[in-house]
């Protein structure tokens, strides 16, 4: 198969789904897929074997849940628009408002949806502000001091999101803050949604701690249904982005392998977070971006070769580095970025008209199926 291509591996996806299904059973809670991290709808038949619902944050995501997943969505949006609201209601089973003003404006049009409010516990351990939903001045959620003692009679639940690829020890501390600030309203509720960012499929995740936390929570609040809505956890380490070396250039002694993919177009979190992805067969070498220090070429003494990896766009900063390989790279050689299924295909763009990677599935029987191939028409029709 030609590169570039995202390859999702069915065996790895089913592994995650089975694990999440077992966690849901042991914690007596519902776990639903957040489309903001993963929305490859051609895989939904597999998901339906393990979960029964999804979460949406826009009309398009809500329609995807209803029309392609086959079940109404748990929907939350920072702000609903008047002209979209009725269609969102049609596609939703649960509807969470970000503010009391949005609730007042729309709740009478919400039909049979189970209504909720997003709360802000004013606590999050997410260090990168770009991904911290509880940072000072955040636009997300209602703080405890703004809630009335008696909630509106049609509010059935609270929604709280304050994690990002977090462990259960972080959730334990977050839960303490949530209960301290908001538990006095729990008797008025039917459900609570603890949001996403619970990375239960990571190898070092302490599942037993989560089970204990939920056992205690259910004992304290036996009437509350508990919901988790991770995204990354479902697609965590389920497949790579495969690229090829198109050219190798050198400037001031720095070698850059230019690839047929782009960090800014196809791996945006690498630049936004930022973080260095794992490259198969290579070792990332720490070197501060923009540093005046010379690149660590002394590491090449062991026979390795050091390269920056550059994207094929005209953005000057569309590169990352350095990686050490055990051989000199050649034009046409494949460079494989591991764990590139979550927060990639949902965030890619066609900046510069760069060819979008195809999407394929490696089935459990070893066959490789092309799910989507992108063409010039996809780029052109965005401007139509």
Where are these regions (language model features)?
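N-terminal capping/small domains of soluble enzymes
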Residues: 1-69, 80, 262, 325-338, ...
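Short glycine/threonine-rich loop-to-helix capping motif typified by GTGT followed
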Residues: 167-173, 201-210, 237-243, 324-325
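Active-site-proximal beta-alpha core segment in soluble small-molecule metabolic enzymes
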Residues: 29-191, 205, 213-216
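Glycine-rich beta-strand-to-loop/alpha-helix junction loops that act as flexible
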Residues: 35, 162-163, 192-201, 230-233
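Feature marks short, surface-exposed loop/turn motifs that line or immediately flank catalytic pockets
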Residues: 123-125, 164, 200, 234, ...
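Structured core elements
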Residues: 96, 116-118, 159, 193, ...
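Charged (often Lys/Glu-rich) extended helix/loop segments that serve as interaction or gating elements
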Residues: 230-384
